[in-house]
Amino acid sequence: MGPSAPLLLFFLLSWPGSLQGQQHHLVEYMERRLAALEERLAQCQDQSSRHAAELRDFKNKMLPLLEVAEKERETLRTEADSISGRVDRLEREVDYLETQNPALPCVELDEKVTGGPGTKGKGRRNEKYDMVTDCSYTISQVRSMKILKRFGGSAGLWTKDPLGPAEKIYVLDGTQNDTAFVFPRLRDFTLTMAARKASRIRVPFPWVGTGQLVYGGFLYYARRPPGGAGGGGELENTLQLIKFHLANRTVVDSSVFPAERLIPPYGLTVDTYIDLAADEEGLWAVYATREDDRHLCLAKLDPQTLDTEQQWDTPCPRENAEAAFVICGTLYVVYNTRPASRARIQCSFDASGTLTPERAALSYFPRRYGAHASLRYNPRERQLYAWDDGYQIVYKLEMKKKEEEV
């Protein structure tokens, strides 16, 4: 053996003892870790037990409170149902009283109503209108209403074309705007994001008020002529009628409305100066002038040329009027109060003379307390399309035959 043999022998003899020492330390380390884990698990179990006990206590405390809240909710629901029933009964009683004791129609005799033809403006004035159709209906009552949605601002107009596609909806938001929304169907208009489904039509001149009309594929509206809004001179109180082709998106005709010193016809809708309307007979315009600032005027227009064919001074007051529409040649004026209350048709004027104002029925709008910014009659559907503080509403009308004047 060499000199290193004893050292190697010593190393081999001492090696098993070193391994045994390492294993012993490892076992002790594992035991300490397991003991720590067991202690933590015990703490978690204690905390879980404590939380479970707290939850049980909280549940036991809340159950009686929930029972009391449920009883109070049932009591409130019963009271609400009772109040709703009482309100319904009161409304029926009010409707009955209004039917039994109607307010007198707004009729004021005036020399201009019964006098001869006027000398101002185009067309004949205050002459009996000769009906071009056999339409002989008048409103019996505003039967029902349906609120479609809320779209746009407090003032605007929504309508259909009575001579165009039956489903297409036109929406003109605001009293001074130049963009109209067109919806292919009513269902598209009622969607939450309706504006994304609409096509937009921009007119070359902004409209004034909410007196626009869609009729026969054209948009008829009033605008201030150049220099008309505060410009002085003859154009100070005049308006220009525009006939806009919706398909071609071009102005096909325009005409200065033949009435001087125009004022808003409706005392409660001060942004509208000319309110255009369509019925079974054609195109009409409702307006007022300073010459008689107490009453409304009515004009029959030629939809082709925008010429004024006839004009009438009506007995319907401007005060508290908010909107109007025409059915079978008869103007119906809607009145309200400020603050807004229940709207009512309280004055009518039949251009043909068949229906006298005294015989016209006073009709209240059903269960709606608001202010109409516009009303559009659709002769094809016999419905009114209303704009009430941004809400779009449809009113169904019940008709009856006109009584012949004796």
Curated annotation (Swiss-Prot):
GO terms for cellular component: extracellular space. Glycans are attached at residue 248. It comes from the Eukaryota. The keyword Coiled coil applies. The keyword Disulfide bond applies. Disulfide bonds join 135-328. PROSITE patterns: OLF. Residues 1-21 form the signal peptide. InterPro entries: Olfac-like_dom, Olfactomedin-like_domain. Residues 22-101 form a coiled coil. Secreted scaffold protein that plays an essential role in dorsoventral patterning during early development. Stabilizes axial formation by restricting chordin (CHRD) activity on the dorsal side. Acts by facilitating the association between the tolloid proteases and their substrate chordin (CHRD), leading to enhance chordin (CHRD) degradation. May have matrix-related function involved in placental and embryonic development, or play a similar role in other physiological processes. Belongs to the OLFML3 family. This is Olfactomedin-like protein 3. It comes from Rattus norvegicus.
